Amino acid sequence: MKKLLSAAVVAAMALCGSAHAAEITMAANSTGKNLDFLRKLFVEFEKQTGHKVTLATMPPSSTEQFAQYRLWLAAGNSDIDVYQTDVIWAPQLADQFVDLKEAASDVVDQFFPSIIASQTVDGRLVAMPMFTDAPALYYRKDLLEKYGKAVPKTWQELAATAKEIQDKEREASQKDIWGFVFQANAYEGLTCNALEWIKSSGGGQIVEPDGTISVNNEKAAAALEQAKSWIGTISPPGVLSYQEEEARGVWQTGNAVFMRNWPYAYSLGNGADSAVKGKFDVAPLPVAAAGDKPSSTLGGWNLAVSRYSDEQEAAIALVKFLTSAEVQKGRAIENSNLPTLQALYDDPDIAAAQPFMPNWKPIFQDAVPRPSAVTKVKYNEVSSRFWSAVHNTLSGSGTAAENLELLEVELTELMGSSW
């Protein structure tokens, strides 16, 4: 692999024409094994280029990350050269990042066009896709087999199966087990979860592609009320403060029958220290009724170069290295992160290491985007208003119908004459 990585770096350096050893800093989140994987790659990159890469560790919460990024970029901070960015941030931060279109012209056709499009703003490629994301339903196949249950296809089936297995396992001395864990803290992750409940129930996607505010409807309200009914019955009350890692912690210790989470949790769940190693599988998220289409929120992480960086050439070389086929292959095998390069879904090594991954391709290809493209720079506010309304509902502060009605008023005011 070292030879392949070296080739990727050499190609990137040739394109950028960097002639001196640079010191660059990359901001990246601490979810799962991301930081450990990056540190290994930095060693190889430094060896091949002579550059020095420092890691600026960010919290796993994308909401906290975005807030810090905005502060740095608004101040014209040159300390951070490369930013790991969420798929939804491109429209909001585009003006702060370098256009990578020319630098990536030799490889851009290898990526999924829809993912490249998500990072293109006004014709400028503001970030290179590092890995894509779409959540799925993790389930304990051993427990479903034990009780003769099928993988649930609807949310109602999920609740019933989760409750039955949870209760029977508790009777059999598994006192700490819960039926279903997910992410219900008041942050961007709750927007993702709630969008899935609503969209899969025919309730729209908060703000439609044409800019119409659609969230205040009966199907959306019913979806939220259904989720509210899980709290304290099949989901622990503490789920209201769970983000991805808290949900994974409960799941990986063997204390949940089902979990909604992103692909990164797959390899960790099969780690040597996992209580559920070899005992689980994944399936598409449930729907409201048979015949409805599963709705996984489109996620993914990208790499952007700051326009305030004093080492843009070296920063671009690092971005091309970290998004290369060889690195994405390693990330898929080691971290179970979904590649953004089309050809890797036919790679036999990836299929052998992560048998689920080829089957995940249609999940993310049909994934539902959050309304960041249509709401543009106002998306962060749209999302925070939405997740607040959802969290209030789940917490018992007002009904879903009441909270969505108030949300519609707030979003209409926020939109003004246009998004």
Task: Give residue ranges: language-model regions.
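Hinge/lid segment of periplasmic solute-binding proteins
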Residues: D86-P135, K175-D176, L190-N193, S200, ...
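Long, aromatic- and glycine/proline-rich binding clefts that accommodate carbohydrate-like moieties
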Residues: S114, S118-Q119, A283-L285, I333-R385, ...
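Short, well-ordered beta-strand elements
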Residues: A22-G32, H51-T57, D81-V82, V126, ...
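Glycine-centered hinge/linker elements that transmit conformational signals in sensory
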Residues: A162, P209-L240, L285
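Extracytoplasmic/periplasmic solute-binding protein
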Residues: V126-M130, P135, A159-T212, A256
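Extracytoplasmic "Venus flytrap"/periplasmic binding protein-like
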Residues: T25, E44-S114, S118-T120, D142-K153, ...
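Short, solvent-exposed loop/beta-turn-alpha elements that line the ligand-binding surface or hinge
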Residues: K101-P113, G179-E188, S201-A222, G271-A275, ...
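Short, polar/charged alpha-helical segment
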Residues: G32-V53, F386, L404
